[in-house]
Amino acid sequence: QKKDKKDRFPNGLV
């Protein structure tokens, strides 16, 4: 799930 990363880091820290 690529959305998992955006969901956890909506700020784009990762």
Swiss-Prot record:
Entry comment describing in which tissues the protein is expressed: Expressed by the venom gland.
Keyword Glycosyltransferase: no
Superkingdom, natural source: Eukaryota
Residue numbers carrying Valine amide: 14
Keywords from the named record: Amidation, Pyrrolidone carboxylic acid, Secreted
Disulphides: none
Modified sites of kind Pyrrolidone carboxylic acid: 1
Stated name of the protein: Tachykinin-like peptide-XV
Species this protein is from: Phoneutria nigriventer (Brazilian armed spider)
